[in-house]
Amino acid sequence: MQQLPIEKYSELLTKKQQKLTALLAPFNAPELSVFVSPVQNYRMRAEFRVWHDKGDLYHIMFNQQTKQRYRVDCFPIASLLINRMMENLIPLLKEQEILTKKLFQIDYLSTLSNKIIVSLLYHKTLTEEWQAAAQALKVRLEKLDFDVQIVGRATKQKICLERDYADEVLPVNGRNYVYRQIENSFTQPNAAVNCKMLEWAIGCTKNSSGDLLELYCGNGNFSIALAQNFRKVLATEIAKPSVAAAQFNIAENGIDNLQIIRMSAEEFTQAMNGVREFNRLKGIDLKSYECNTIFVDPPRAGLDPDTVKLVQNYDRILYISCNPNTLCNNLTELTKTHRIEKAALFDQFPYTDHMESGVWLIRK
């Protein structure tokens, strides 16, 4: 992996700031708050293909322009923990053929709390013999002071030696929040910038009245931190593992005013409007919620037209976006009813064109 252009970090970030400012200008956005990233070792997860070469074994990636593969022995954007694991794991794997045969990918998920999950992906069925070898590997890594979980994956097969999650601890405004992160589920890749996003969101919603609704809350990353600013919080999520992690996180952080329901945004809209009833909502009185603030963090495609209409029903909208172009598409409609009170750029992905942004909208 080539060295990072650290000396150009500020210049590259300024270009992003200028680009986002120009995109938001038609919507009368205030001056951007800009949140910087660490200049290296900021990424908490990484995925690599594995190359087998005459008895040798190493991580590879592909050049996005030329599609040529290149060897990766260290990865400066990834956490120090991932780099140390990469260095130690490969020699240990090579000692046991059953662990390297048909191995085609290695995924790493690390935490600020110094835990790491290593997922080994295979083009073969995993046997008890593989499991025994993987267990021996885990013991060897633990002797090297790694707090490690190993997960084996193959077609229609997943083997956890102990567990498939790691508990992250994020410092936010002087308080530590525990977040259970599940292997192969979405987590924010840049933990340092995630903490800044949470602090910004808490600052926007301070002194809020009423309740908060969050669509697609994942493991509760935002709703758990924001719960302090609201009477009650209602959050939806469709992925079962994320719901389970969110329930753990609610209990672990002592949050008593947050309810997670497993349903899509469309289903939730039907339930709120009384169009149909859902067994999943038994015991939850939707009418007891006075949600006048809504939080959305949609995928790159942004909000679909129906969800935009739903969101416009709320007096205050907190919108986190990973794609400024689709954010602006949505703002064309949203700014007909709301004005942008605050706007922010979060440098989740240094040295790339990707921009994570946030807008805080208030009804006109």
From Swiss-Prot:
GO terms for cellular component: cytosol. PROSITE patterns: SAM_MT_RNA_M5U, TRMA_1, TRMA_2. Keywords: Methyltransferase, S-adenosyl-L-methionine, Transferase, tRNA processing. It is an enzyme of class 2 (transferase). The active site is at C322 (nucleophile), E356 (proton acceptor). S-adenosyl-L-methionine binds at Q188, Y216, N221, E237, D297. InterPro entries: MeTrfase_TrmA_AS, MeTrfase_TrmA_CS, SAM-dependent_MTases_sf, TrmA_MeTrfase, U5_MeTrfase_fam. Belongs to the class I-like SAM-binding methyltransferase superfamily. RNA M5U methyltransferase family. TrmA subfamily. Gene3D superfamilies: 2.40.50.1070, Vaccinia Virus protein VP39. Its EC number is 2.1.1.-, 2.1.1.35. GO terms for molecular function: rRNA binding; tRNA (uracil(54)-C5)-methyltransferase activity, S-adenosyl methionine-dependent; tRNA binding. GO terms for biological process: tRNA methylation. It comes from Mannheimia succiniciproducens (strain KCTC 0769BP / MBEL55E). Dual-specificity methyltransferase that catalyzes the formation of 5-methyluridine at position 54 (m5U54) in all tRNAs, and that of position 341 (m5U341) in tmRNA (transfer-mRNA). Pfam families: tRNA_U5-meth_tr (PF05958). The keyword ATP-binding does not apply. This is tRNA/tmRNA (uracil-C(5))-methyltransferase. It catalyses: uridine(54) in tRNA + S-adenosyl-L-methionine = 5-methyluridine(54) in tRNA + S-adenosyl-L-homocysteine + H(+); uridine(341) in tmRNA + S-adenosyl-L-methionine = 5-methyluridine(341) in tmRNA + S-adenosyl-L-homocysteine + H(+). The keyword tRNA processing applies.
